């Protein structure tokens, strides 16, 4: 976001008991699509090649720890947390020890986790929603392009009955 290419950017790790999806999401103006994708790929490559430096680790810890209480604020978020604990066979100690566990994560462990969890930049799948005429040729550099109109039945929920 510091490059001014996006309105927002985030990555989401689908936490399951088996490997899941890692999603990088962003919203950018059409003319900046390729530049934003290239930047995301370069960040992913840097994570694989160099991991996080001490400043990056501290920043990530602060962000993750700061967001954790919001996972316990509402009835819905508590229900999600209970489901998460059950799914992963965790108890209350997960919540009680979350901060200390996060603080104890060593840079080497973080680097190993990045290598195991985040996809290789050469094996990415892109889902782009936007002006196909404006980005079609430019995004072809990432691989074969399949276009689906937003009016296709698979994109549109069935009408209410």
Regions found by a protein language model. Name each.
Residues 1-49, 54-107, 112-116, 120-129, ...:
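M16 family metallopeptidases and their MPP-like homologs
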Residues 71, 128-161:
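An aromatic/glycine/proline-enriched structural segment found at the starts
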């Amino acid at each position: 976001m510091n490059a001014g290419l996006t309105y927002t950017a985030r990555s989401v790790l689908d936490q399951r008991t088996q490997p899941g999806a890692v999603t990088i999401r962003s919203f950018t103006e059409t003319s900046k699509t390729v530049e934003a994708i290239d930047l995301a790929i370069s960040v992913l490559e840097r994570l694989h090649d160099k991991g996080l430096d001490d400043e990056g680790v501290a920043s990530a810890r602060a962000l993750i720890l700061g967001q954790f209480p919001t996972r316990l604020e509402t009835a819905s978020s508590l229900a999600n947390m209970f489901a998460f604990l059950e799914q992963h066979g965790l108890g209350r100690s997960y919540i009680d020890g979350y901060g200390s566990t996060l603080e104890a994560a060593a840079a080497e462990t973080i680097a190993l986790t990045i290598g195991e969890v985040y996809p290789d930049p050469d094996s990415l799948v892109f889902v782009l929603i936007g002006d196909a005429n404006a980005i079609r040729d430019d995004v072809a550099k990432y691989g074969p392009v399949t276009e689906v109109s937003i009016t296709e039945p698979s994109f549109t929920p069935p009408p209410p009955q």
